[in-house]
Amino acid sequence: MADKPIKEEKPRSVDPTVLELMPECTEQAIGTAWDRLKKQSPQCGFGQKGVCCRICAMGPCRLDPVKEKLKYGVCGVDCDTVAARNFVRMIAAGAAAHSDHGRGVAETFLATAKGEAPGYEIKDEQKLLQVALDLGIEIGDRSVQDLAIEVGEKCLGMFGEQTGPIPFLKRAPLKRQAIWKEHNMEPRGVDREVVEIMHRTHMGVDQDPVNLMQQGSRCALADGWGGSMIATELQDIIFGTPQPILGRCNLGVLKKDEVNIIVHGHEPTLSEMINVVAQDPEMIKKAKEKGAKGINLGGMCCSANEILMRHGVPNVGNFLQQELALATGAVDVMTVDVQCIMDALPKIAACYHTKFISTNYRAKMSGAIHIQFEEHDAVNIAKQIVQAAIDNFPNRGNVHIPDISCDLIAGFSHETINYLLGGMFRASYKPLNDNIINGRIRGIAGVVGCNNPKTTHDSDHLALVKELIANDVIVLQTGCSAIACAKEGLMLPEAAAKHAGKGLAEVCETVGIPPVLHMGACVDNSRILMAATAVVKQGGLGDDISDLPAAGAAPEWMSEKAISIGQYFVASGVYTVFGTTFPTMGAPGFTDLLFNKYEKIVGGKWDFEPDVSVMARKMIEHIDNKRAALGIDKAKERVLYDMAMRRELDG
């Protein structure tokens, strides 16, 4: 039996499906993340503030810069070095998670190119050519297969490269590349940067917070411009580059009269194949023989975002809804791969009829059925999982599915935005730049990240995004933050008229887009990097990402991946603010480095703001300051261009 719930006064969520299912959890004596957090409270203040050191067996040491007896650890280390070590170790873990995802995709990609992965194929040949060019590969009249093999080998090579720099850095603006080179931040190989952090943070090695952060930046950049970018680009080539697509989201997408399968995790190699198999007429026939009307596939967390933006597969919910999905009693199989999968899930599944299936050797779980996924036998493994769900359908007990879901438009890849703005034959970011310059759009914000039970579920995402779009800031989203806003209806074109400021609403209506754009899963933050780079290269808004009227935020973060993402945005020149908690607040010197001094080095900086209204104000103020620096802070007279004037502009 799972943990028993306890009374909670603070609102757990603003999502009505969550609130509706809480009594179900209480009745079944199923504790959730909220219950377990309450039992853990009060949490260790030293750990929360980043000043607990467990690196050697002379400790653990708890440091406090104010109390004389706690100023130094046993080895003499101070709080700033401890916080820096802990922080860059979080970067290493986050970068390793995203980059190992990228490695797995590269391996599947290469197997596909060699014809060794039945069921997978090269779907976007145009993007294959573009990636090959960016990797410095000669195209000539080579076959698609030959080109794909070299792309796969070159991407896999980025992980073990020893000298660097990694090739995708050349995609960044030239000024940004020069900054990285000047400060010795160019990643060599993805794996090398993670290993070097672990060496530097061993007892008695790197004891300089500035030097530690130099390596932290290099490792984070190896994630954003390396491992994550590899994952995004190669997934687009073999699964298809996302285009605008209609979908539905929230727990109400589960169906009482159909076999329900949830794919949860991050790597789309498995979920793509389950999506294919779930539509197989033979499998649907088998489901009907068991009394179901069909097979309903849904996604959770970033697996949801992956298959939503390519196929319109319903999105069941974000991070803090994974336990509640099982509490509906309607899930016949939940299959998981890696990352953000709560340890409690097998215990909760055991309270119902649900079969909980793990599929990745990196992520086995006690109480789970393990079916190892292999790309060379993907179809048969997917059939095995779908068959398990079909066979389990008759075993259901009571079912309680909240009748709440919402439409959304997903699929806004960097390429799609390009075409939407400029047209199929003249794809360009110029209309976006023009509308930023003329003030209709105030700026750009990336709002991304997780959920955290320390704050009311989804509330900070929604409050921040609504405030930003009301002030004419267009919002780009990934991950669980994207799901939060999708459930609120903010990813529909009509949301612009309801929530956006006059200028942004006008642009959204003209182009036919929502004011909040779904750009994918957490690895797809690399799409936001590419979009920012495209804006710079289009011209008129400076010559570096740090010049843009843009900001980033993760208001409800909880994962080490979020720290790596935040650092690669900061190191790329973006002001980045996190909410809820921040893991360096017990080290004033190191925090000052991140929040202030670091901007002089890389043009971007960190910030922490638990009050989401203040967070929005800080982001808008930063955007306004960047507009002023560009000289576009004052509205300009509108000019109606005749054809001759337009030709002159085009020339």
What name fits each language-model region?
Residues 2-651:
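Anaerobic metallocofactor- and corrinoid-dependent redox/one-carbon enzyme cores
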